[in-house]
Design a protein with these regions (language model features):
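Conserved ABC nucleotide-binding domain
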Residues: 70-72, 120-139
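Helix-to-loop junction immediately C-terminal to a conserved catalytic motif
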Residues: 48
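The feature captures the beta-strand-to-loop junction immediately N-terminal to the Walker
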Residues: 33-35
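Conserved structural motif at the start of ABC-family nucleotide-binding domains
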Residues: 2, 17-19
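ABC-type ATPase nucleotide-binding domains, specifically the catalytic core motifs of the NBD
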Residues: 12, 52, 75, 98-115, ...
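ABC ATPase C-loop
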Residues: 151-152
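Short beta-strand immediately N-terminal to the Walker A/P-loop
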Residues: 30-31, 85
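ABC ATPase NBD Q-loop/coupling interface
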Residues: 57-80
Length: 153
């Protein structure tokens, strides 16, 4: 479970997130809506660890484990415990194959995982057929699947 309590963020002197409270339970899916410049991307970047919070509390509570304070954790550490997102621009390596993109994500993620072993392909079987194709040659939908698979590794 992800829990945010009174989270604040500033860009310089500009207050970009004001006392944000959010609870996301296992299996839930939420949408964050708002006009341009309202803090949606800032919120996601704070949760993922790409931006620091100025104040407030962010905790991650995995099933069967005590709540963990996310504040001191790096983006890589947060990714290792299962926190990630797919940005709008997808950020795949366009000159690398699907399989190479997944191997890079695995190297930065969970030790001992193996993309060619097929675990990720069980969740994204379409990617298996495309595993030798370069990212640039994939359709937009396939690029999003690859980006999502990378985020979930």
């Amino acid at each position: 479970m992800l829990n945010l309590q009174a989270v604040n963020h500033f860009y310089g002197n500009q207050h970009s997130l004001w006392n944000v409270d959010l609870v996301l339970r296992p299996g839930e899916c939420i949408g964050v809506l708002g006009r341009e410049g309202m803090g949606k991307t800032t919120l996601v970047n704070c949760i993922a660890g790409h931006l620091p919070v100025a104040s407030g509390r962010m905790t991650w509570h995995d099933i069967g484990a005590p709540p963990q304070d996310l504040t001191p954790l790096s983006a890589q550490s947060r990714s290792a415990i299962g926190i990630g997102y797919v940005p709008q621009d997808k950020r795949i390596f366009s000159q690398l194959s699907v399989e190479e993109n997944l191997h890079i994500a695995l190297a930065a993620g969970k030790p001992g995982a193996n993309a060619s072993g097929g675990e990720i392909y069980e969740h994204f079987p379409e990617l298996y057929a495309l595993r030798q194709r370069k990212g640039a040659s994939l359709s937009d939908d396939d690029q999003y699947q690859l980006a999502l698979a990378r985020a979930l590794i």
